[in-house]
Design a protein with these regions (language model features):
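Gram-negative bacterial Sec-dependent N-terminal signal peptides
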Residues: 1-16
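Glycoside hydrolase catalytic-domain context in secreted enzymes
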Residues: 18-699, 706-723, 742
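Short beta-strand elements
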Residues: 725-740
Length: 743
């Protein structure tokens, strides 16, 4: 979504804003046939549709921005919630509530302004993906969904599952990484958690919206099979596991057609092949037509006044009256909105306005657990971490670590309970401001450091920081990379001369640990000179406490990378980012010539050695994987093995199962086929059994819309990362065909 500050134009007060008739009470509605909870959502939808007027149907497919736009001649609907993302009128006489929409994937966001909501923020989506734990995804989703409901919202624009094809993408921090199985599983679990609160979650940004530069104008070129085995597979898995009520189509074009009027994406794949029964909503400003958009699968225009025109509403009514859009299609559009509302109990268990009864202390523990489980220990020479007792002087340097932790920017921005830790940071317009959550790593470290003197230096003067480092027993440098919606980073280097700062500090004291607060991968020219590196991502509301607990060993790090960290930008499929950020209206093509070879698959295919591979993550303990076996029966590959904690402390292991086809059959040498995360005490062992989705063993066949597994010997490997195999076996698979959904 795009925020108010980025708008250039438009629009007066909303249509359909006349006073509605007084809503009947729930008791008065109880006898209506569509209120019978024993009927299916589909049956109830058809019953209530028959009672609706044409205008009421048109109401359901037109959404408005929930924030006033000063100087733009737009006032939000009075029924909307202030500084919110969106609002859709319901049909109160029939018991159909309004839709109150809030961004986004890490919590209840607010549009920038004087009266922001202060809410709990999860860590970044990238952090949650790095947990490799769907239970963590579900718990976080359930928590932010509860806050949304308590804040008066019944729809969250959460569920970003765009694959990380482009490491410089400013929104990567919102997403679930580069692998379709991992991303789809984690995001699907989060959607399920959100919707457990009887609200709708939104799978987005559909599809192939993998960079911010030129996002409104670029055209993605990729063939059907490649998309089905990569980006679309991530959406397919998230849809299957999360069952979202809505899907948000994206800004970009795909094969020359805008995503929000693209019949291939919306009608053929999403609604046809996958059987999606909910509704498709546009991103804010992503609708471009009336007839084409409606007929090609868009069900709801969102975010008036961001589009150039009100394409739905009166214009859609005229198109139906003239036969340009069939009446049956309008009924389908409104029916899909109603279906989602019935299916996810927005009608049976309606929100009743903001309650502000949030248990922030309890929710802080949920987000803290997510942060702790997603942090990735990338280097730990000579067991520099966890921090040992008996140190006399500890230096903490950089990135406002004295007061808080960084978050990602844009429409997903959650404003912290207690206010921003650092005031006055830009940008002054969208996607700003830069927000630090008031959870101080320095205070968390001081609380655990015993009699050690803990000194903070802001890092603005590398020479002064180096002098402090030289006089300290241990140095912890906090480094940051702010990323946000609406722009991509120019390169993967840390900004603000931080590489020079880290190099100077490490030269002064080799007992230096670096804590990274980044949206994704960064380069590390100083890596060989530091003792330890902890990737903390954007760690959310309780991030400072979580960092302190991991640094001191109260929590054993168990995160594993959901993306590849390249050694240089020259290793990427596109070393230079397509498009020109200085010419945002330039139309251009982005050719995904790598096809389905995204992330680690590209590195495997080209024989490239990354800085850190996909799936990588160290621990304060050690694990072994033994007894690997693979068995094919009844069209299903099952893999089993035993994990043992061979170290001295408790920890969690992420066992990764990779599968490799007979040579040359796939887009890359191997694919992630399954994964399992387990907590084990020292000396404890446990047998694990996982199943590999048949689609991950197959090639997609566009001609007949099937997945075909070729007969032959397949290699099955249990590994600690994409480049760290522990054991391998071969298994003979027969030629097998499954349908478009892997059945």
């Amino acid at each position: 979504m795009i925020a108010a500050c980025a708008l250039g134009g438009l629009m007066a007060s909303p249509a359909f804003a006349q006073e509605p008739a007084p809503a009947p009470t729930r008791q008065e509605l109880a006898g209506k046939p569509w209120m019978n909870t024993h009927l299916s959502a589909a049956e109830r939808t058809q019953l209530v549709l028959k009672e609706m007027t044409q205008e009421e149907k048109l109401r359901l497919v037109m959404g408005y921005f929930g924030t006033d736009l000063d100087g733009k001649h737009y006032k939000r609907p009075k029924e909307s919630l202030h500084q919110s993302a969106g609002f859709v009128y319901g049909v109160p006489r029939l018991g159909i509530p309004n839709q109150w929409q809030t961004d986004a994937g890490v919590g209840v966001a607010s549009q920038r302004g004087p009266n922001v909501r202060e809410r709990t923020s999860l860590p970044s989506g990238m952090n949650t993906a790095a947990t490799w734990n769907p239970e963590v995804g579900f718990a976080g989703g359930a928590m932010i969904g509860a806050e949304a409901r308590s804040s008066g919202f019944n729809e969250m624009l959460a569920g970003g599952v765009n694959l990380v094809r482009e490491p410089r993408n400013g929104r990567n921090f919102e997403y679930g990484g580069e692998d379709p199985l991992l991303a789809g599983t984690i995001v699907g679990a989060q959607i399920k958690g959100i919707q457990s609160n009887h609200i709708i979650s939104t799978l987005k940004h559909y599809a192939l919206n993998d960079q911010e530069t030129g996002r409104n104008f670029l055209n993605v070129e990729v063939d059907d099979a490649a998309a089905r085995m990569s980006d679309l597979l991530a959406f397919q898995i998230a849809n299957e596991q999360g069952q979202p009520g809505s899907v948000m189509c994206s800004y970009n074009r795909v094969d020359g057609i805008y995503a929000c009027e693209n019949p291939y994406l919306l009608n053929e794949v999403l609604k046809g092949d996958w059987g999606f029964k909910g509704f498709v909503m546009s991103d804010w400003g992503a609708t471009h037509s009336t007839v084409q958009a409606a007929n090609n699968g868009l069900d709801q225009q969102s975010g008036v006044p961001f589009d150039k025109s009100r394409y739905f509403g009166d214009a859609l009514g005229e198109a139906v009256a003239n036969g340009w859009v069939p009446q049956k299609r309008l009924d389908d559009m409104a029916g899909r909105v109603l279906y989602a509302m019935f299916e996810h109990k927005l009608i049976d268990d309606p929100v009743t306005g903001p309650k502000n009864n949030i248990d922030f202390a309890a929710h802080a523990k949920v987000t803290q657990n997510d942060a702790e489980e997603g942090m990735v220990l990338l280097k730990n020479d000579n067991a520099l971490l966890p921090i040992k007792a008996g140190l006399k002087k500890i230096a903490i340097i950089g990135s406002h670590a004295d007061v808080g932790v960084l978050s990602g920017g844009g429409s997903s921005q959650v404003y912290p309970v207690g206010g921003m830790a650092v005031k006055g940071l830009g940008p002054d317009s969208f996607p700003g401001p830069t927000v630090y959550f008031p959870s101080s790593p320095l205070k968390a470290i001081q609380a655990r450091a015993g009699n050690a003197k803990v000194t903070f230096n802001d890092g603005s003067d590398p020479a002064a920081a180096a002098r402090l480092a030289a006089a300290s027993d241990l140095v912890i440098v906090f480094a940051h990379q702010w990323t946000a919606e609406a722009f991509d980073v120019p390169n993967l280097s840390l900004p603000d001369n931080q590489d020079a700062l880290i190099a100077a500090v490490a030269k002064a004291n080799p007992h230096t640990a670096v804590v990274l607060e980044t949206g994704g991968a960064v380069l590390m020219p100083w890596l060989k000179d530091v003792g330890a590196v902890l990737e903390a991502w954007y760690p959310g509301t309780s991030g400072g406490e979580a960092i302190g607990r991991v640094l001191f060993g109260e929590v054993n790090p168990s995160g594993h990378l959901p993306i590849t960290f390249p050694a240089s930008e020259q290793q990427l499929p596109r070393p230079v980012l397509d498009g020109d950020p200085k010419k945002p209206e330039l139309r251009f093509d982005v050719n995904y010539s790598e096809g389905a070879a995204v992330g680690y698959k590209w590195f495997d295919l080209k024989g490239l050695k990354p800085l850190f591979p996909f799936g990588y993550g160290l621990s304060y303990t050690s694990f072994s994987h033994d007894g690997l076996a693979a068995h094919w029966a009844d069209g299903q590959l099952t893999v089993s093995f035993t994990i043992k904690n061979t170290g001295a402390v408790a920890g969690k292991d992420v066992a990764q199962v990779y599968v490799a086809s007979p040579k040359g059959l796939w887009e890359a040498p191997k694919r992630l086929g399954a994964f399992q995360k387990l907590a084990l005490k020292p000396g404890e062992s446990r047998k694990v059994s996982v199943k590999v989705d048949p689609r991950l063993l197959a090639m997609y066949q566009s001609k007949d819309k099937t997945w075909k597994i070729a007969s032959g010997e397949y290699q099955v490997t249990v590994a600690k990362s994409a480049l760290d195999p522990q054991a391998s076996v071969t298994v003979k698979l027969p030629a097998t065909t499954v349908d478009v959904n892997g059945k």
